[in-house]
């Protein structure tokens, strides 16, 4: 077994694979059990699947919590039981000729911000100890509580394509969203807001944790690279797992405190801070000075020393102005 590997892989998940299938395959390729993924993709969905290897698996919770970017396609005119193109048709509402692109764009804009979303029946959300898809496969529909999600942007990226014979409208979209967002449900809710049934007909994740679709690598290629002894050339550093968190660069004194898990008071800090990159793109982030950590708007921050991730800190749940280590990595 190879237990010395450590880092993040940008895997291109192909259609037909579950996220767990990818993890299982990689365990065989890399000869290690310490592997996990940073956010489930449905089998039919393709694109970026961040994979943590070795000690980086300790950061999976931050990878899963990170925002994601997707590009896909909405079809308005009929809905399916699974809310995507794989399910059986359950409702047909032929689209009238007077539906305009401006109406669609206006409707999409109303989904931007913090919204409530009811998870679909065909999902892994648990209710009373059972996953929703287990109820759905048994022919049951049960009440699901709405969950708050954040949609940073939701825009149409193509002209609408009319199929007047079948009364269908199709168009492409791009969405940047928070953890827990069901994009297929977003497509269904968009169509419903326009007065029609609809579903998500295609989807690809294009960015996550600073990893981009253009750099994603298929499993077959990863296997080739591993066999050639060049795996280190495609392993990203652990810091990619915390790309959504503000970055605080520690002084030597603060590093000595962090490495032994000491708490910090906001008033003790004067540090260089980098803001998390909102486009989920690995670029040099803007730097500025903080006189104290109260200016941070997040509940956590990533602590770096000599350009290496050393810890993740969080606001103390009970003590105002105190930050405690959530995870120490050195």
From Swiss-Prot:
It holds the Pfam family TruB_N. The keyword Glycoprotein does not apply. Transmembrane segments: none annotated. The keyword rRNA-binding does not apply. Keywords: Isomerase, tRNA processing. It catalyses: uridine(55) in tRNA = pseudouridine(55) in tRNA. Its EC number is 5.4.99.25. GO terms for molecular function: RNA binding; tRNA pseudouridine(55) synthase activity. One of its GO terms (biological process) is mRNA pseudouridine synthesis. It is an enzyme of class 5 (isomerase). Responsible for synthesis of pseudouridine from uracil-55 in the psi GC loop of transfer RNAs. Belongs to the pseudouridine synthase TruB family. Type 1 subfamily. This is tRNA pseudouridine synthase B. The gene is truB.
């Amino acid at each position: 077994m190879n237990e010395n590997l450590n880092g993040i892989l940008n895997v291109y998940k192909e259609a037909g694979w579950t996220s767990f299938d990818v993890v299982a395959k990689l365990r065989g390729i890399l000869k290690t059990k310490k592997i996990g993924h940073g956010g489930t993709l449905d089998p039919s969905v393709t694109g970026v699947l961040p994979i943590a290897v070795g000690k980086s698996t300790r950061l999976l919770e931050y990878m899963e919590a990170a925002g994601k970017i997707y590009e896909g396609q909405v079809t308005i005119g009929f809905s399916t039981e699974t809310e995507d193109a794989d399910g059986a048709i359950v409702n047909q509402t032929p689209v009238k000729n007077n539906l305009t692109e401006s109406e669609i764009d206006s409707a999409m804009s109303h989904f931007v911000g913090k919204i409530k979303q009811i998870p679909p029946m065909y999902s892994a959300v648990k209710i009373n100890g059972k996953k929703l898809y287990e109820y759905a496969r048994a022919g049951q529909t049960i009440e699901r509580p709405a969950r708050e999600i954040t949609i940073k942007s939701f825009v149409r990226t193509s002209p609408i394509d009319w199929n007047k014979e079948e009364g269908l409208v199709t168009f492409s979209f791009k969405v940047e969203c928070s953890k827990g967002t069901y994009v297929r449900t977003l497509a269904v809710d968009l169509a419903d807001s326009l007065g029609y049934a609809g579903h998500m007909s295609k989807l690809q994740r294009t960015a996550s944790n600073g990893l981009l679709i253009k750099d994603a690598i298929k499993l077959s290629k990863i296997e080739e690279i591993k066999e050639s002894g060049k795996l280190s050339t495609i392993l990203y550093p652990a810091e990619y797992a915390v790309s959504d968190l503000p970055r605080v660069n520690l002084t030597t004194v603060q590093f000595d405190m962090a490495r032994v898990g000491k708490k910090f008071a906001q008033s003790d800090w004067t540090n260089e801070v980098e803001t998390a990159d909102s486009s989920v793109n690995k670029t040099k982030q803007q730097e500025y000075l903080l006189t104290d950590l109260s200016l941070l708007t997040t509940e956590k921050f990533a602590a770096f020393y000599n350009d290496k991730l050393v810890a993740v800190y969080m606001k103390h749940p009970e003590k105002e102005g105190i930050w405690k280590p959530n995870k120490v990595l050195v």
